[in-house]
Amino acid sequence: MPKVILESHSKPTDSVFLQPWIKALIEDNSEHDQYHPSGHVIPSLTKQDLALPHMSPTILTNPCHFAKITKFYNVCDYKVYASIRDSSHQILVEFSQECVSNFERTHNCRITSETTNCLMIIGDADLVYVTNSRAMSHFKICLSNISSKEIVPVLNVNQATIFDIDQVGSLSTFPFVYKYL
């Protein structure tokens, strides 16, 4: 009898919670004025949602709350500059001072300490557009290698917590979404 591979098993995933949402989020908000932040592209979460994310229907039914931190680039003025990914793309992200402070008080550890490749819950996020020079100064990354555009979207996250502390890396590489815009 021939071996049958179901569509759900044709592409290996490292988490059932990670779904592709970054590219769609950018495309849905591309009509927005790029010089002003778009308001709450990822909805805010309540304290109950953040305290018990495994039991929150708000979190579990919205895939844009799930992300993995792929790399930390810089820490400046209590803001953390990093990149996150979904199941197919990466995007640059800025964790606000309030987000970093709340995360570190809740988890009794630095947000940059052993959280790379952990499954995170994010909320209350805006989409801001930054120039290549601002990205270079904050992220210490040259966007000309990633995107031909002069300004690129960056996710400004105001809420974050850990969903799964296991640091499961992936053998696959995940391109920045900027290549597809």
Curated annotation (Swiss-Prot):
Compartments where found: Nucleus; Chromosome, Telomere
Gene Ontology, cellular component aspect: chromosome, telomeric region; cytosol; nucleus; telomerase holoenzyme complex
GO molecular-function terms, A-Z: DNA/RNA helicase activity; GTPase activity; telomeric DNA binding
Record Gene3D superfamilies: 2.40.50.960
InterPro entries: TPP1/Est3
Major subcellular site: nucleus
Protein family according to the UniProt entry: Belongs to the EST3 family.
Subunit structure: Homodimer. Component of the telomerase complex composed of EST1, EST2, EST3 and the RNA component TLC1. Interacts with the telomerase RNA component TLC1 in presence of EST2.
Name of this protein: Telomere replication protein EST3
Taxonomic source organism: Saccharomyces cerevisiae (strain ATCC 204508 / S288c) (Baker's yeast)
Gene: EST3
